[in-house]
Structure formats: structure tokens, C-alpha cells
């Protein structure tokens, strides 16, 4: 059987009234109390009791010179072979450290702000990890896809050729796929990009030689030549 002695003290008064019937041993499990006694001493009102449980709560301690309710839950770990004495200083809730005992007990409320700041920092770090910046290859691929799509649309608007619109749309869709796969599968994405850029360079270069039109044939063919070299460089860098 473990014996536990709990002593409650107050910073403002040496007289405390202990209400053992308020939340005393408020637990759903059975706790056989063999003995309960009150002892008087200078500045303390010890409550001594014995129980078979190792964790015992104590609450509802009210000072004689205050109308505020001091609620304190005390949990102590006991050993079966000895007696432990715990001196309790109850925490008075006066809202942000004001009033009686505010300087001593109210300052602990700032810990929640630190936890909130830590949570916000963690959230910002997770957001920073999710929103990774685009690489130069992705930016060039995205601009290249936009240029090819606009070129196909311009060919359709000028000559009414649905073939130009379809070719421009499919080419832009493939380049968008390359854009999405570059961070995770750079070799595969660069290989698809080389094939697409080479095909566009040949087709648009041939059209430019016939029509001598700078846009879209001339601009797309030059951009395709640049992107072909860029994708080949990306493949070689990824393999090494």
C-alpha cells in the first residue's frame, strides 16, 4: 500500500480551506481509500490519505481571503515502500498575470503563443517544400508549348487550315507532358522533348523555306532548334 502526503500552500494567506468533497479522487475506476485525515501546521494544511492507486488527483482548493476558485489537479507517482511529500502551489487564473499572484503564476500563459508560432513556422516550411520553384528547363518548355499552340491557332485563323490547329494543339499537349515530367523523370521527359522539338524544327523549317514567313514558321523553327539542343544537354547531364 502506497502512502502519499500532499501539502497545499498559498502565496497570499496561510489559511486554506480544503474541500475534499469537490473533485476529490474524481475517477471512473474504483480507488479504495483506507484513511483520510487533516493536520494543522503553520502555513500548511496537509491532506494525508492512502490508496492502492499510484496516480491520485486533488482539486478545489480555495483560499480564505479570496473569492476566486483555485483548481489544481495533482498527479503523483508513489512507490510501495515509502512515503513522498509534495508541496503544492496552486495556480490562480487572473487572466494574463494581473491581480494577486499574477507575477508569479500568470506568466506561464505565454507558452501557447510559442507553440502557435512553431506551428505556423512548420506550416510555412511545408508550404515552401510543396511550392518548389520552376527550373529553367521547365520555364523554357512551358514557353515553347505556348508558342507552338499559338502558332497552330494563327495558322488556322489565317488560312482556315484545321491541320495546323490540330498539329499545334497536339504538339502543345505533348510539351506540357514534358513540362510536368521534367522534375521527376528528366531522362524520359527530355527524350520526348528531343523527338518533338526535332519534328517541329523539320516541319516548320520546311514551311519557312517555302513561305518566308517569320511567324509562326520562322520563330517556331528557331525555337525548336534551341530546345532540341537543350533537351540533349539535359539527357547527358542526367545520365552523368
UniProtKB/Swiss-Prot annotation:
Biased composition (Gly residues): 97-113
Region of interest (Disordered), ranges: 97-134
Keyword Transit peptide listed: yes
UniProt keyword Methyltransferase, yes or no: no
GO cellular component: chloroplast; chloroplast envelope; chloroplast membrane; cytosol; plastid
Subcellular location: Plastid, Chloroplast membrane
Transit peptide: first to last position: 1-84
Regions of compositional bias (Acidic residues) in chain numbering: 114-125
Spans traversing the lipid bilayer: 164-184, 186-206, 214-234
Pfam families xrefs: Tmemb_14
UniProt main location, coarse: plastid
Source superkingdom: Eukaryota
Signal peptide range in chain numbering: none
Keywords: Chloroplast, Membrane, Plastid, Transit peptide, Transmembrane, Transmembrane helix
InterPro entries xref list: TMEM14, TMEM14_sf
Topology in the lipid bilayer: Multi-pass membrane protein
Family, per entry: Belongs to the TMEM14 family.
Protein role: May be involved in free fatty acids export from the plastids.
Additional observations: For all TMEM14 proteins, 4 hydrophobic alpha-helical domains are predicted. However, NMR structure determination of the human TMEM14A showed that only 3 of these helices are membrane-spaning while the amphiphilic N-terminal helix is probably located at the lipid micelle-water interface.
Protein known as: Protein FATTY ACID EXPORT 2, chloroplastic
Organism per entry: Arabidopsis thaliana
Lineage of the species this protein comes from: Eukaryota, Viridiplantae, Streptophyta, Embryophyta, Tracheophyta
